[in-house]
């Protein structure tokens, strides 16, 4: 059996906790990834797709009206402008090319908000791969536009009714399917979590977010930002933003987890600050679990952050104090969803609205000139029906009071 080429751990987090049957498939994936990273032809094709199909580089936009403090400039890294509507497209193109390189004909994926599913469906349509997407039945309901998009592009969408019928259950089903079909199928994992080598692959295929940001902010401001801020579910958009800044000690890295109905309630999805280390989804990582070690249901108004664990590199960055992790509630995210639309003409994804909410809160307290960059990880078209229903219900409640 070949040895691993890359370190499967970030400090104490990560690893490859999978059934023995999947170990060869993961080792094959790692080996193909390492080779591809050193192959100029692979890199050229990936770069070409990012530029001419996905639309990179994305803009770095200085907000005109969002900052509550004249001392603070808030920039948005516009992953919402990427083809497919979110940062997900970046690494999906990378993994789909990798799958073709390994001779795989089928792609299996899981999705929460549907953005990863859409990105996977478009990459499969483009590259001629068969596509199967597992999605929690609850998410199928709350993300109908994305379900239709996936089907339109030829993907088979499989609703998962087990457990809480959300993202973690979709992950389990996708992993189960892959265990039975890894000889012909590639599991295209959607976040920087799961068993090694996925957290490393996803980070490397998302790191252009931070690389572009660094170049763009130096051009615009002549210096690095004081902080980069991103929402964290599994953590792929955040690690994509953080990766190129980890070795820049002057830049604070801030991840924003979903506080849901409040951190003091069971209705949240913030395992980094409020979970215990456990084994889940093939990795060792902070996990929302009860006293008996059973996985607790996570909760967030945003389907893409509704995940009971988090990527191992985020857990490590938190443990060593290199990044700090805050949280924003449903109400704060909903308020910011509307505020950005009204004051900048940009409708953010509910996920990204969590990061924006914390950035604005942080800006209020600044006492010196400060530059903040928020990763606007996706656009909010997928969320307009959810938000419209919530606002209508709130209006009705206040009318009944």
Swiss-Prot record:
The gene is trpB. PANTHER family: TRYPTOPHAN SYNTHASE, TRYPTOPHAN SYNTHASE-RELATED. It comes from Shewanella denitrificans (strain OS217 / ATCC BAA-1090 / DSM 15013). It comes from the Bacteria. PROSITE patterns: TRP_SYNTHASE_BETA. Tetramer of two alpha and two beta chains. Its cofactor is pyridoxal 5'-phosphate. It is an enzyme of class 4 (lyase). The modification N6-(pyridoxal phosphate)lysine is found at residue 88. This is Tryptophan synthase beta chain. CDD domains: Trp-synth_B.
């Amino acid at each position: 059996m070949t040895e691993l080429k890359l370190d499967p751990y970030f400090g104490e987090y990560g690893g490859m906790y999978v059934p023995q049957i999947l170990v060869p498939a993961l080792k094959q994936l790692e080996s193909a990834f390492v080779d591809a990273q050193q192959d100029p032809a692979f890199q050229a094709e990936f770069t070409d797709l990012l530029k001419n199909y996905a639309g990179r580089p994305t803009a770095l936009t200085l907000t005109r009206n969002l900052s509550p403090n004249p001392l603070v400039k808030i920039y948005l890294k516009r992953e919402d402008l990427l083809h497919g509507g979110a940062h997900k497209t970046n690494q999906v193109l990378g993994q789909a090319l990798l799958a073709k390189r390994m001779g795989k004909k089928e792609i299996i994926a899981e999705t929460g908000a549907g953005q990863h599913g859409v990105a996977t469906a478009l990459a499969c349509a483009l590259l001629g791969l068969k596509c199967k997407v597992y999605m929690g039945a609850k998410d199928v309901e709350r993300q109908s536009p994305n379900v239709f998009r996936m089907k339109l592009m030829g993907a088979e969408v499989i609703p998962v009714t087990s457990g809480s019928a959300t993202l973690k259950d979709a992950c389990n089903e996708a992993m189960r399917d892959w265990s039975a079909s890894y000889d012909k199928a590639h599991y295209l994992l959607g976040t920087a979590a799961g068993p090694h080598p996925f957290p490393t692959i996803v980070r490397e295929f998302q790191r252009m977010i931070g690389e572009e940001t660094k170049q763009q902010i130096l051009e615009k401001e002549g210096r690095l930002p004081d902080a980069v801020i991103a929402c964290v579910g599994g953590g792929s958009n955040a690690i994509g933003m953080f990766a190129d800044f980890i070795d820049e000690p002057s830049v604070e890295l801030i991840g924003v987890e979903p506080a849901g109905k409040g951190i003091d309630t069971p209705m949240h999805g913030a395992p980094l600050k409020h979970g215990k280390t456990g084994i889940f989804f093939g990795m060792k990582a902070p996990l929302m679990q009860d006293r008996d070690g059973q996985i607790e249901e996570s909760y967030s108004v945003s389907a893409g952050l509704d995940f009971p664990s988090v990527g191992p590199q985020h857990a490590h960055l938190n443990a060593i104090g290199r990044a700090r992790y805050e949280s924003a509630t449903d109400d704060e995210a909903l308020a910011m969803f509307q505020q950005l639309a009204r004051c900048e003409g940009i409708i953010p994804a509910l996920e990204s609205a969590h990061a924006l909410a914390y950035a604005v809160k942080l800006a209020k307290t600044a006492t010196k000139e400060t530059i903040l960059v928020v990763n606007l990880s996706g656009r909010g078209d997928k969320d307009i029906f959810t938000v419209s229903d919530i606002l209508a219900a709130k209006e009705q409640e206040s009318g009944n009071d």
